[in-house]
Design a protein with these regions (language model features):
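Catalytic phosphate/metal-binding cores of nucleic-acid and nucleotide-processing enzymes, i.e., regions
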Residues: 2-120
Length: 120
């Protein structure tokens, strides 16, 4: 596969913000989120909106696919940054053994969907 995943401070970057910024891409976070939701649905799964009252900073979506462990997904634009609270929540989930991904932009979403499709 053409991309490399990096584990940094308890969460996974499928790609760095610097790389995404260099590509000059620009897409709103809600558009990126729609691509993820539609792509997971096309694979027979669900990408539930994760809302947890009293727990600000939790990832945006919980992805559930047939026969696979859940994935917690935080979506950002190509130039987006995690807040300190998001970093804390991601670390908490990782400490519980959960698969947490931070996806920056449409290309990261496409790579994630390909990974899920092909079981990489």
């Amino acid at each position: 596969m053409a991309h490399m995943a990096h584990i940094i401070q308890g969460y996974i970057h499928v790609r760095t913000r610097a790389t995404a910024t260099q590509e000059g891409c620009s897409m709103l976070e809600r558009e990126i989120e729609k691509k993820l939701v539609d792509g997971i649905r096309n694979q027979g799964g669900r990408a539930y909106k994760f809302v947890s009252p009293g727990n600000d900073g939790v990832p945006d979506r919980i992805v559930i696919l047939p026969g696979k462990a859940p994935k917690f997904i935080e979506l950002k634009t190509e130039t987006g940054k995690l807040s300190n609270l998001q970093r804390v929540q991601i670390t908490r989930l990782k400490d519980l053994g959960q698969d947490v991904r931070v996806l920056y932009g449409l290309e990261d979403v496409k790579e994630f969907l390909e990974e899920m499709q092909h079981g990489i």
